Structures are given as structure tokens and as C-alpha cells.
Amino acid sequence: MNSSPAGTPSPQPSRANGNINLGPSANPNAQPTDFDFLKVIGKGNYGKVLLAKRKSDGAFYAVKVLQKKSILKKKEQSHIMAERSVLLKNVRHPFLVGLRYSFQTPEKLYFVLDYVNGGELFFHLQRERRFLEPRARFYAAEVASAIGYLHSLNIIYRDLKPENILLDCQGHVVLTDFGLCKEGVEPEDTTSTFCGTPEYLAPEVLRKEPYDRAVDWWCLGAVLYEMLHGLPPFYSQDVSQMYENILHQPLQIPGGRTVAACDLLQSLLHKDQRQRLGSKADFLEIKNHVFFSPINWDDLYHKRLTPPFNPNVTGPADLKHFDPEFTQEAVSKSIGCTPDTVASSSGASSAFLGFSYAPEDDDILDC
């Protein structure tokens, strides 16, 4: 799938009456009845992610179906439109999920995404408790590559956590869920929205101070710590206590790790964002840290490195790496129906102008 040519500026969202308009776009031919919706493979605040098979060619996709009513009720349409905008910019990076196309009905929004069935990093961590350093290094390197690419587009990710890191059928990382991304953040710029997931919030976010790209490198440190030790670095079941720990408790690294790993964790999880690794030269500082010295970054980017773990999926219908809580849920028949257009208010339609997107072409994944 191709988006707009490299170097072509994307249209800037315009706002009126709280609605978000990404500019002219349309996908009039796409509709829910194009797919057989087979299984629920994920759930979120506003809808579900389903394994879907396109009737025309038998291709498998992950289709994220969101309820407009729920989004509008919480006034979150800007996050949904930001996710759509960011997804269009990410299609050329090997470790970011690709948007094939998007469309809408009067009641729902549909993201048609790459189908990735190697499981969430969270799923594998829950099962294995922790990873050895070589495996953690491989995943951290691929995630850092993806974050560095987003930063090169002036995008802060802001929600890095194991649940948003998928593995593909070969075991490579795929970063997903761009709803909290902030676009248009230049290297010297800051932003101040309080958002993220409690276990991975950086101190500057908790202090409600202006923050910059270094917030993502804190999150990388938190995820790496969790991969190596089984829990986030300042974890407590009491969220208030966890926030206190993030703000004031010195980082405690259990024994058994290399000096390089300990130094990287200390550098990424520095409470002063100005002193944090990545705060000056961004991704270049991460790449050059001694912990990543075994990594050939060019080979990594081109997927010439063999992943340390193979999910061993037998094909698209192999759902063993998805939570049975999702896959055993019945698929609502309404998801695959094209409803009567008269049934929806014009307000819901105007709130998502520019959401629909049709690609110039449509490639099929290798697995």
C-alpha cells in the first residue's frame, strides 16, 4: 500500500465546532459487507479488533471497529483522527502496523490494518515472566527503531507499553495503536497533555510539566525493565504509591544483569528529562549505547536478523497467541452490516470528515 509520496506534506487537520476535518478524502466503495468477520482478537475503550477475511480475494486483515457514539460521548474524536493521520505516515516502516484503508458507516468507523498474529509482547511476558538479555535487546532495538522513525516525522508516541507491541508471524516487533500520538512536535518543541498508561508515565508527565520526545525514551526504559525483570520499574498495585515511586524513588535494578543493561536502564529512566538518554540526539543516542553494540542496525531495519523467538503460527487462522477471553466472544452480526444511512445523525458524520481513506494499491502480507 502506498500513501502520499515522500516529501509531500500531509493536509493539516482543521477544526470547527469540535469536529476534526482531515481534508478531502473518500472511500465510497468500501463497506462492512466486503468482509467475513471471523473472530474478536482485541478490545478497547470504543470498540473491538476483529480478524476479518475479505470476500473478494480471501486476504486476512485486522479490522478495528469503533463506535462513533462512544467516541463523541467522551469527546475523543481528535484522538481517533490523529490515529488515522499517523497510520498513513507509518506504512513504510517495518516495525509499525500498516493501515490498508479506512471507511465509515453512520454508526461506526473501520480501520483495515495489517493482520499480526504472533501475539502481544504482554501476552508472552505474562506466560514467560521475563526474557533473557539477547531477546529483550532485540525487541528493544526494533521498538527504538520505530520510535526513532516517528520522531523523525515530528510525532511523539506517548503510549509505549507491552500491550501495544505485537509480534508478527516471524517474531519481529510491530508497534500498534496510535491514538495518543502527538503530531507536529519539532525537536525543540514541548507539549503538555496528561496522557499515557500509569505504569509507564514519565515523571515530567506526572508533574504536569511541558515534555518533549524524551518521554518516549522513558517508556522504552520502562518496557525494557519489564522485559528483563517481569514488572514495570516502579510498580505498585496502589496507583498513587506508584506515582510517588516514579517521582521520588531511586531506580532499583535487581542483580544478574550486565553492566551495559544496568547503565542503559539508568540512562533511560533518568527522572530529569534533560539528562535522559535520547534527550539531545534522540534515537542516535540510543543506537550508540553499548547495550546495543551487538546490533547491526541496517540488518535490523531490513529484517535480516533472525528473531530470538518464533511464534510458530500455522497460518492466519492460528489464534493461539491471542487471549481466549477475546477469541471466545461471539462476533456481533451488526459489525458486518451496512446500516441504513438515514438512521444516523448528521452530527456523527460531520465529526469524522476525512476519516475514510482509499489506497492507490493494496499489497498482501507475506503471513
Swiss-Prot record:
One of its GO terms (cellular component) is nucleoplasm. The modification Phosphothreonine is found at T193. One of its GO terms (biological process) is regulation of cell population proliferation. Residues 1-26 are annotated as: Disordered. Belongs to the protein kinase superfamily. AGC Ser/Thr protein kinase family. GO terms for molecular function: ATP binding; potassium channel regulator activity; protein serine kinase activity; protein serine/threonine kinase activity; sodium channel regulator activity. InterPro entries: AGC-kinase_C, Kinase-like_dom_sf, Pkinase_C, Prot_kinase_dom, Protein_kinase_ATP_BS, Ser/Thr_kinase_AS. The modification Phosphotyrosine is found at Y357. It comes from Homo sapiens. Transmembrane segments: none annotated. A motif (Nuclear localization signal) lies at residues 68-78. Residues 35-292 form the Protein kinase domain. It is found in: Cytoplasm; Nucleus. Serine/threonine-protein kinase which is involved in the regulation of a wide variety of ion channels, membrane transporters, cell growth, survival and proliferation. Up-regulates Na(+) channels: SCNN1A/ENAC, K(+) channels: KCNA3/Kv1.3, KCNE1 and KCNQ1, amino acid transporter: SLC6A19, glutamate transporter: SLC1A6/EAAT4, glutamate receptors: GRIA1/GLUR1 and GRIK2/GLUR6, Na(+)/H(+) exchanger: SLC9A3/NHE3, and the Na(+)/K(+) ATPase. Keywords: ATP-binding, Cytoplasm, Kinase, Nucleotide-binding, Nucleus, Phosphoprotein, Serine/threonine-protein kinase, Transferase. It catalyses: L-seryl-[protein] + ATP = O-phospho-L-seryl-[protein] + ADP + H(+); L-threonyl-[protein] + ATP = O-phospho-L-threonyl-[protein] + ADP + H(+). This is Serine/threonine-protein kinase Sgk2. ATP binds at I41, G42, K43, G44, N45, Y46, G47, K48, V49, K64. Two specific sites, one in the kinase domain (Thr-193) and the other in the C-terminal regulatory region (Ser-356), need to be phosphorylated for its full activation. Its main location: cytoplasm. Highly expressed in liver, kidney and pancreas, and at lower levels in brain.
